[in-house]
Amino acid sequence: SLKGMISVGPWGGSGGNYWSFKANHAITEIVIHVKDNIKSISFKDASGDISGTFGGKDPRENEKGDEKKIKIHWPTEYLKSISGSYGDYNGVLVIRSLSFITNLTTYGPFGSTSGGESFSIPIADSVVVGFHGRAGYYLDALGIFVQPVPHGTISFGPWGGPAGDDAFNFKVGSWIKDIIIYADAAINSIAFKDANGHCYGKFGGQDPNDIGVEKKVEIDGNLEHLKSISGTYGNYKGFEVVTSLSFITNVTKHGPFGIASGTSFSIPIEGSLVTGFHGKSGYYLDSIGIYVKPRDVEGSISIGPWGGSGGDPWSYTANEGINQIIIYAGSNIKSVAFKDTSGLDSATFGGVNPKDTGEKNTVSINWPSEYLTSISGTYGQYKFKDVFTTITSLSFTTNLATYGPFGKASATSFSIPIHNNMVVGFHGRAGDYLDAIGIFVKPDTAV
């Protein structure tokens, strides 16, 4: 499935009823009741969702156990695995003890470790995204749902000119800590250092008569992380090169460095962590792009939205592959709706004006061999009694084809130079019409 979950276990007995819990976000709290065995368990995720309590149905006061709370300091800390033991308690085979293993430490053991069968999971590069098992009076059995730690990265760009003898391309294992820029009227060169002290570059700077002035950006990875870049590219001394650059973190914007001239570029992106750069260089920095990975465990990145500020916000995330898009369009986009391979239909976003509903268009996507990778389109003013800023045209791009444009193109266009990704959802604003639209993407290695 798109979610890429693996089920491990359960361990324990066959009593009680089956249960399962899959977190929408990272698991941040586990509450257990425990004495000589695990009486009950419940979970909370980063969005504040609580799972309900599994077990703990023995009505006797002396069987309630003591409450223990494990807090996981996501996103720096995340749950990787569990271990424990199961054995006889009051004539029932149940979970006797449990430990919770994160990337930083082990919490536990909780309960009685003497006797019974122990279990552990020799697993690496995993994130626990849910639990399953059996429960009734006590916690009879327990297993986990895991995902791989998302190593997958998405490439944006490059932006700039086509020249440059030296291509560069790197990804870091930690975070980008220092950026050293030489710039004057353009970006002469750039170099990077990661948190482990590895250096990348210098890229560019081969004109001995024009090296620029040194500037340095320092990023404290505990509080601040690089999430995007923006800049301009254009003609400098007869070359098409990057003329200015800014580095956008979750805290601030560093820059611009150089002098803005020519064509501007930016990428409205959230939930992202820049893990590397790519591009070309020679005398100057000819072009630059970024590698990003999802900052959160669930692994989707939000891009956009583009369009107007009217209507109400909406969002849709598919359970499986998106295989159908229904667009009502005329001189603008009236509404969109989506369907995925699990048969889940989204709501219709837009289309509230009954006097202006447009023509129906259906895009069918032959998932899994074909999958949605991006969108492009235009937005601008649309008049029906009042004037609205809405999405006026839309195209949908898959790994195989582009469908559209639907609607009628207007002045302001948008597109996303993006690779190695899959669209897993949409968001935006809508009311009488489709006011704005953006996408949620994942690295396609997560398919």
From Swiss-Prot:
GO biological process, one term: heterophilic cell-cell adhesion via plasma membrane cell adhesion molecules
Superkingdom: Eukaryota
Post-translational changes noted in the entry: The N-terminus is blocked.
Residues annotated as transmembrane: none
CDD domains: Jacalin
An example molecular function term from Gene Ontology annotations: D-mannose binding
Annotated segments matching region 3 X approximate tandem repeats: 1-447
Alphabetic keyword roster: Lectin, Mannose-binding, Repeat
Residue ranges annotated for the Jacalin-type lectin domain, each copy included: 5-148, 153-294, 300-443
InterPro entries: Jacalin-like_lectin_dom, Jacalin-like_lectin_dom_plant, Jacalin-like_lectin_dom_sf
PROSITE patterns, alphabetized: JACALIN_LECTIN
SMART domains assigned to the protein according to its UniProt record, in alphabetical order: Jacalin (SM00915)
Spans of repeat Sequence: 1-149, 150-295, 296-447
Pfam families registered for this protein in UniProt: Jacalin
SUPFAM superfamilies: Mannose-binding lectins (SSF51101)
Assembly and interaction partners: Homodimer.
Protein purpose: Mannose/glucose specific lectin. Shows agglutinating activity against rabbit erythrocytes.
Record-stated family: Belongs to the jacalin lectin family.
Extra information: PubMed:11502201 authors report the absence of the blocked N-terminal residue, together with 3 to 5 amino acids from the N-terminal part of the protein.
Name of protein: Mannose/glucose-specific lectin
Species: Parkia platycephala
Organism taxonomic ancestry: Eukaryota, Viridiplantae, Streptophyta, Embryophyta, Tracheophyta
